[in-house]
Amino acid sequence: MLEFKNILYPIDLDSEKISSIKTALEFAQLFNCRVHILYVNDIEAGYRHPADHEDAVALKVKEVVAASLLEIADITYAVSKGDTVEEIVKYTQANHIDMIIIGHKHRGRLYASLFDSTDVKLIDNVLLPVLVIPEH
């Protein structure tokens, strides 16, 4: 049987749709494991968010997730700077991540043909199970 101790949830602070975080926390509760919530600030994008600290990430999560779920969850907040996928891969290796849960926003065909989404790049670059949750 698969055993999960550490799950990574990369969060996009630009997105209004992060409902998948609830699924990640419920999954972690089911398997009794820790959830690492990582925000990667893209250096080329500049400082659009005051998210250089874990507190800013925690505040965004508290806006979306019920307090009752947060109280029972084992959460580690983390912030990094650099290429999103590279930083996620580094974090998974440094923190013994067993699985990644990531939200996916549906894009139109034109957008999808021109750009790779972070979740697709991530699946191509990690050797871990990746659970992709549709955002709604």
Language model features with spans:
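Short, hinge-like loop/turn segments at secondary-structure boundaries
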Residues: 52-56, 118-120
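Gly/Ser-rich helix-loop-strand patches that form or flank binding pockets
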Residues: 93-136
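Short, solvent-exposed loop/turn segments at secondary-structure boundaries
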Residues: 48-52, 112-115
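Short, flexible hinge/linker loops that cap or flank conserved catalytic cores
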Residues: 1-2, 124
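Small/aliphatic-rich secondary-structure junction motif
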Residues: 2-51
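Structural beta-alpha unit
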Residues: 2, 69-100, 106
